[in-house]
Amino acid sequence: MTSNLEAQLLALRQEGEKAIAAADTLERLEELRVNYLGKKGELGALLRSMGQMSAEERPKIGAIANTVKESLQTSLDQQRVALEAAQIQVQLEAETLDVTMPGIYSPQGRIHPLNGIIDRALDIFVGMGYTVAQGPEMETDYYNFEALNTPPDHPARDMQDTFYLPDGNLLRTHTSSVQIRYMEREEPPIRVVAPGRVYRRDNVDATHSAVFHQIELLAIDEGLTFTDLKGTIKVFLQAIFGDLPIRFRASYFPFTEPSAEVDLQWNGRWLEVMGCGMVDPNVLKSVGYDPEVYTGFAAGFGVERFAMVLHQIDDIRRLYASDLRFLQQF
């Protein structure tokens, strides 16, 4: 009985190795694996007859069976590797693309000067503890004007021409509307900076555009003063322009009181770079804040203005022309 089963196992190994070597597809190889090593395969069928053997015969046959199984598994693995390699080679030969050829060079992109200013400014304010907030560019009259202490009959509305839409909404004229929406959602203390596109009915020339970018900041807390505002602006401008002289001039904005313009001495002359002021109590009331408890300050600047000063650009239209000869300088 032992010698007969031993001969059958050796014959099975020989037959299996021959069949595996002849397999020419991965599908055929899988069929052979199931046929020889599967639960209902030929090796399993032979091993089930070991139950008729004596206890002395089983160890010898078991060792032979393990050897046969390992040999067949090794043959299967080797043939699988060979077939997969052949399959890849056929695929490569069939493809029209030669993967060994050098690729097509794609020139590295550059950061647009406007995006560079925005990223730099936001990094500075985030480092000072401010949160970045976004809002809709199509706004309601309430958020763009009324909540900012500019009712319908307020003379300050004559200061800026607005793009009104047929449904009564408008294209925002500043990102201050984002601050109102943010204050409605959050409780003080607040430190928020709002970047984004704004729209005004300006005639397009070297220094004006109907669409441009603003960044505005807002801080609301107990005990904030104009000194805090000045300190914040000085830190920001020094981080952008370096340690240059700065001055504050009295000005007027409907949503701040007192208000000021910020000038920077650049190349021997004073340049207006920002507007700022203490948040008007009426604005605080419109969002449900108690002006007897909280005070705040706000400031804003045009991104295009900063880009033109820093990069000595003489025409704002260059920033939108998509002229690679110009943009590759940055």
UniProtKB/Swiss-Prot annotation:
Task: Please state what class of enzyme this protein is.
Answer: ligase
Q: Sorted alphabetically, which Pfam families does this protein's record hold?
A: Phe_tRNA-synt_N (PF02912), tRNA-synt_2d (PF01409)
- Where, by residue number, does Mg(2+) bind? E257
Location, primary (coarse class) = cytoplasm
Which Gene3D superfamilies does the UniProt entry name for this protein?
Bira Bifunctional Protein, Domain 2
Q: Give the matching NCBIfam families.
A: pheS
Q: Kindly provide the name given to this protein in its UniProt entry.
A: Phenylalanine--tRNA ligase alpha subunit
The organism is Nostoc punctiforme (strain ATCC 29133 / PCC 73102)
